[in-house]
Amino acid sequence: MARTLPIQKTTLLKKEEVKKDWYLINAEGQTLGRLATRIALVLMGKNKPNWTPHVDCGNFVVVINADKIKLTGKKWDQKIYYRHSGYPGGIKEFTARQLQQRNPEKLIQLAVKRMLPKTILGRKALKRLKIYAGSEHPHSAQKPIELNF
């Protein structure tokens, strides 16, 4: 007679059971793409053991020193970002170096945004990302946990 194994039940979180933590990441000397993948995982909550795909169980992430990010190779001059106003001939293009000088937070935000899912949960996760160019941030009251990569 064949022995049957007990059926294991998958535990699914409800949105009331989710605890959102605050994490602090220092971007100084970090490579942009590698840092963005780790930030995206924490924002979606995939670093938690009880991650549930249909529930917003992500965390808050505070990134400091965004102006000291690193790009490999010749990407500072060869990587091009595009923006369009919606009017004919309204396309603008910027190199990574120009974008970094104009708005250093935007470089990390765009990299993380493009790694998140293009759904409602992805848009909610992006709102939990706080990026600052310097080493100061106004979220010390939340006591963020420092993540080292």
From Swiss-Prot:
- Which superkingdom, per the lineage? Bacteria
**PANTHER family referenced in this protein's UniProt entry, alphabetically:** LARGE RIBOSOMAL SUBUNIT PROTEIN UL13M (PTHR11545:SF2), RIBOSOMAL PROTEIN L13 (PTHR11545)
> What keywords were assigned to this record?
Ribonucleoprotein, Ribosomal protein
Q: Does the keyword Transmembrane apply?
A: no
Question: What NCBIfam families does the entry give?
Answer: rplM_bact (TIGR01066)
Which GO terms of the cellular component aspect does the record hold?
cytosolic large ribosomal subunit
User: Its function?
Assistant: This protein is one of the early assembly proteins of the 50S ribosomal subunit, although it is not seen to bind rRNA by itself. It is important during the early stages of 50S assembly.
- Tell me which InterPro entries the record gives: Ribosomal_uL13, Ribosomal_uL13_bac-type, Ribosomal_uL13_CS, Ribosomal_uL13_sf
Q: Which CDD domains match?
A: Ribosomal_L13
Subunit record text: Part of the 50S ribosomal subunit.
Asked whether the UniProt record includes Iron among its keywords, one would answer no
State the family named in the UniProt similarity comment for this chain: Belongs to the universal ribosomal protein uL13 family.
HAMAP family for the chain? Ribosomal_uL13 (MF_01366)
Q: What is this protein called?
A: Large ribosomal subunit protein uL13
Give an example GO molecular function. Answer: structural constituent of ribosome
Q: What's any GO biological process attached to this entry? A: negative regulation of translation
